[in-house]
């Protein structure tokens, strides 16, 4: 799968989103055709991680907007084709000012939604494969029917992965056993050749990312299992055994 490159059309940027790196909606030109896209100005390695992981998810069959490498007056930007629907937080009206009890109810509702998607366990395994350190409710897109996975800049060892958020949502939704079983199966089935089938432009080298994911895929099922510790796991070592 080829990473396409494009250019930013001047004076078309409109602020959108509330993420760590403020994104804009803008018009980009790719292969002579104009498209609406979400564009981010982030460090180069984060741009490349976004592009690589976005394509990798697509090769693995997960719904992810196409990533585009943007050249803009000497700067390299990240863009993804605009899916046209909001993230889960916006769709459900989440904000930090609502009472804690309401936040917990919304979080449970969000967890139920994510765990209802047929590919959520596969996405959980894929997040483990790329060491996704920034999955959150703002980077699931959902329009009430269709969904997509976005935001993969804090991956591939560029940022610590302290948790697997989809695994945590599964626990919150009471679906831990179901997602654990499906996640282990997905980890064993992920195509190990997928990273090598991503073709970057001539100026881009993805070899470090390819090697990283290849290493992550070794023992991936075990790492997925470790995201769902059992009571015996939690107590191991306490009695010296």
Predicted regions and their residues:
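C-terminal catalytic region of ATP-dependent kinase domains
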Residues: 143-241
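Catalytic cores of nucleotide-sugar-dependent glycosyltransferases that transfer UDP/GDP/TDP-activated
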Residues: 33, 53, 66, 119, ...
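Residue-level signal for well-ordered alpha-helical segments
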Residues: 3-5, 34-41, 57, 101-112, ...
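Conserved kinase catalytic-core segment
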Residues: 102-161
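Short C-terminal domain-edge/linker segments immediately following a structured domain
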Residues: 68-72, 110-114, 177-184
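Short, surface-exposed, charge-dense and proline/glycine-enriched linear segments
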Residues: 71, 91-106, 163-173
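Conserved ATP-binding subdomain of kinase catalytic cores across diverse folds
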Residues: 1-95, 100, 127-132
